[in-house]
Amino acid sequence: MRMYDIILKKRANVPLTDEEIRFVIDGYVKGDIPDYQVSALLMTIVFNGMSARELGTLTLAMAQSGHMVDLSSIDGITVDKHSTGGVGDKTTLMIGPLVAACGGKVAKMSGRGLGHTGGTIDKMESIPGLKVSLEQDDFIAQVNKIGLAVIGQSEGLAPADKQLYALRDVTGTVDSIPLIASSVMSKKLASGAQAILLDVKVGSGAFMKTLDDARALAKAMVDIGNENGRSVKAVLTDMDRPLGHAIGNALEIREVIDTLKGHGPQDLTHECLIMAAHMLVLSHICDYETALSQVQDALDSGEALERLRLMIEAQGGNIHVINDESLLAIGKFTYDVTAPQDGYITHMNTEQCGIASVMLGAGRTVKDGPIDYSAGIVMHKKTGDSVICGESIATLYASDESLIPNAAKTYVEAITFGTTAPTVVDTILDIVE
C-alpha cells in the first residue's frame, strides 16, 4: 500500500477503504509518512469531503492512536458533553450536577481556553485547592460514588489529532467540516463515554458563524458517533450574545453557584435545563418531558447544587466557595462601561467581548501562558435590553489597571446601540440527532 496511490484515489473522489485510512493514521503517527504527503491528502478531503463511513473510520483511527479510556466499570450509561466553544459558556459546571442529581453518570474530560473562548478547566482551577487531574481509577470511583467527575484531558488522548491539527494549522486545511468533526470526536471516542451531547455554538462568538455550517458540523459529528456505536445528539445554541452575565474564570464560577441556587440569568438557566434533560434521555433514564421535570426539580430542591459541592469536595477544592463568594478571587481594579445614549443594545460582537476579557487577563495570548483567574467582565445589559444614557452596561475587572483602557475600548466597539428593540432569538436553535 502506497500513500501516493491513496492521495490520487481521494483526489479522484473515490472513497478510501478502512484499511487505507488506518494505514495513513498509523503511518503518520509512527513517522513513516511525511508531512507533505499527509498535507496533500488533507487538501483532497477539504475539496471532496468524506462519507459517513470514511469519517467514522478516520475518527476511530485517530482515537486509537493513543490511550483509550475504559469506563466499563462505571455503573450505568456514561454520558459526556462537549461544547464547540463560546463566550460565558460555563454550562458544563451546571449541567453535570443537574444530570448527576437525576441519576446520570457524567464522566467528563474538559479542555482549557482557546482564543476568545473560555475553558472549563481554567474556570475550575479558580476554585482554591481543586484538582483537575485524577488517576483513572479515582475518576471512575468518583463517578460511581457521586455521579460526576470533571477533569482535564490527558496528553495521551488521540495524539494523531494533535499532529494533524498542527499540520492543518499551517496548510490552510483547518476550515473543513469533516476535519473539524473528526478532531472533536476523536477525543470524545477516546474519552470512553457511551453517550455524548454536543453543544454546537452558532453566531458571532462561535467558530461556526452560520446556522447552515453549524448544522453540517453537528450532522457530521452525530454520524461519527453512530458509526462507532455511540449515542450522540447535538443541540445548536445561540452565541450571538455571551451566555449569562459573567465572562472570565472565578466570575463564572460565582455565576454557576448563583444559578444553581436559583438566582441565575434566565438564558443560562434555560439552556442548561434543556441540555441536561437531553443528557438524561441519552442515558436511557427517562423520556424528554419527564427529564425536563426532573432537572427542574433538581435545581429547585438544591440537589444539583449539592452535587457540585460534592464534586468540589471530592477533587480537593474548598467547599466553602458555595456560601462565601469572597473565596473566589475578583480583580481589584474595576471600570464601568456606560451607555452612550438612550435606547437598546441591538447587537453584540460576542467574539470581541471574549477578546476584551482575554485582554484583561482572563485568557491566554500564548499557549500555556499565565491566566488571571480574578479578571473578566460582568455584563449588566445584553442584546435586546433597554439602556439609559450614562448607565453601566458592564463592569470590567482586572488585577493590572493598565490592562483596562484597551480592553474597555474593545468591549465598547463590540456593542451596537439603536432606538428600536431588536428581535432576540431563543438560545436553543435546533436539535440534530
Annotated model-derived regions:
Residues 144-193:
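Phosphate/diphosphate-binding glycine-rich loops and adjacent basic-rich segments that engage nucleotide
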Residues 77-100, 104-116:
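Glycine/serine-rich anion-binding loops at beta->alpha junctions
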Residues 92, 110, 117-122, 154, ...:
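Short acidic, glycine/serine/threonine-rich loops at helix termini
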Residues 109, 143, 151-154, 199-203, ...:
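Short beta-strand segments
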Residues 123-149, 219-225, 229:
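A glycine-rich helix N-cap at a beta->alpha junction
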Residues 1-88, 307-318, 432-433:
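Acidic, glycine/proline-rich low-complexity segments that act as flexible tails and inter-domain linkers
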Residues 47, 93-107, 187-192, 227-228, ...:
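Alpha-helix C-terminal capping segments
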Residues 5, 10, 15-17, 28, ...:
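Well-ordered secondary-structure scaffolds
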